[in-house]
Amino acid sequence: MVNNVTDSSFKNEVLESDLPVMVDFWAEWCGPCKMLIPIIDEISKELQDKVKVLKMNIDENPKTPSEYGIRSIPTIMLFKNGEQKDTKIGLQQKNSLLDWINKSI
């Protein structure tokens, strides 16, 4: 299961993480976001020792998405050593996400 991150826990969970972090920015009303859930869950299990995978509900946590300029969801961001490394927007296939993550970290 993928853990949630909030505006208040973002710095500690993401920016100060020893592992690279993938954050899935989503909303309850977003159809493509719901389609991405099982893919994100599988990636989290497969990469559990290499990458921390988190989800952020943008309706419940508007500050962080605004700071990172998120205008469309789902948006997936990769962070490493406290810095944003790369971004993917829209529904993604598992294999393309895995390739992207492995190249980015």
Curated annotation (Swiss-Prot):
Alphabetic keyword roster: Disulfide bond, Electron transport, Redox-active center, Transport
SUPFAM superfamilies on file: Thioredoxin-like (SSF52833)
Domain Thioredoxin, first and last residues per copy: 1-105
GO cellular component, one term: cytoplasm
Disulfide bridges in this chain: C30-C33
Classification via CDD domains: TRX_family
Alphabetized GO MF terms: protein-disulfide reductase activity
Protein family according to the UniProt entry: Belongs to the thioredoxin family.
Purpose: Component of the thioredoxin-thioredoxin reductase system. Participates in various redox reactions through the reversible oxidation of its active center dithiol to a disulfide and catalyzes dithiol-disulfide exchange reactions.
PANTHER family from the UniProt entry: GEO12009P1 (PTHR45663:SF11)
Name of the protein described by the UniProt record: Thioredoxin
Organism: Rickettsia prowazekii (strain Madrid E)
